[in-house]
From Swiss-Prot:
Keywords: Cytoplasm, Ribonucleoprotein, Ribosomal protein. The keyword Cytoplasm applies. Its main location: cytoplasm. This is Small ribosomal subunit protein uS2. It is found in: Cytoplasm. The lineage of its organism: Eukaryota, Metazoa, Spiralia, Lophotrochozoa, Platyhelminthes. The keyword Transferase does not apply. Belongs to the universal ribosomal protein uS2 family.
Amino acid sequence: MSGGIEALELKEDDIRLMVAAKVHLGSTNANYQMQQYVYDRNDEGNHIIHLNKTWEKLLLAARAICAIENPADVVIIGGQPTWQRGALKFGHYTGTTSVPGRFTPGAFTNQIQSGFKEPRLLIVCDPKGDHQPVREGSAVNIPVIGFCNTDSPLQCVDIGIPCNNDKYSIALMLWMLAREVRRIWGLDPRSQPGDVIMDLFLMREHVDEPPEGPEGEAQEPPFEQGKFDAAEAEAPEWPAESVSPRCWNAGARFRWCWWQLDSLRCKG
C-alpha cells in the first residue's frame, strides 16, 4: 500500500519499536492461511513475521477506517483485560466506538437487545478469542479488521494484520494504527510526532507495595507464615457447666412417620 512513496515507507524508529514490543514474534503454530506472512522460524520454534507485510496491512486497515464517513460507525472490541485500555484510547483518539470487556452475544444480530449496534466496520484484537463478534459481523456483512497471530484463523476476516497479539504488541499496533488514521485525516503531520502518546495504550500493572511507617520505612506484616508456635498458644478453658450429665437427647421432639405408627399398631 505504500506504493514506493517515501512518506509511507516503514521508518527505522518504527522498526525498533516493533522489535522491542515483539511484534514480529509469532507463536509456535502457524495457520495455513498465515504462512504467506511468515519470514522464518527461530531456534525456539516461534515463527517470525515479516514486518514489511505487517506495515502494508496496517496502511490498508487505516485507509479502510478513513473511508467510513462517521467514525462512530467503526467498532473496536478488546475482549481481554490487557487490551481494554488500548481499545479505549484508540476510540478516544479516532472517535470510533470502543467496546472493552466481554462482548454481548447478539449485539449485531438481535434487534430486541438494548445494546444492539449496526457498525459499518469492526476491529478485533484477536479473531480467535473474539470469534463471537467476528461471526456475527460476517452474518450481517460487516467488514472485519483483525490483529492476527500466526495461529489465528482468517475465516470471516477481511483485513488481517499479521502481528503478535500480546499486551505490548497490541498496544503498539493500536497506537500505530491510530497515528496513521489521524495522519490520513490531516490532524497530525507526518513530519511531527503528533498528539497520540504511546504510553497511554499500555495496560498498567498494579503492584502491591508494603505499607510505610511514620519514618518512611516499610513495616513488617503482623503475621508471617512459619512464625506461629503451637506450644506457646494457650488453650481455651471450657466452663464446667457447659457439659450436662443428662442425656443429650433429653427434651427432644420426635416426629413419627406413618409407616412407623403402623408397625407399632401391628405389634400391639
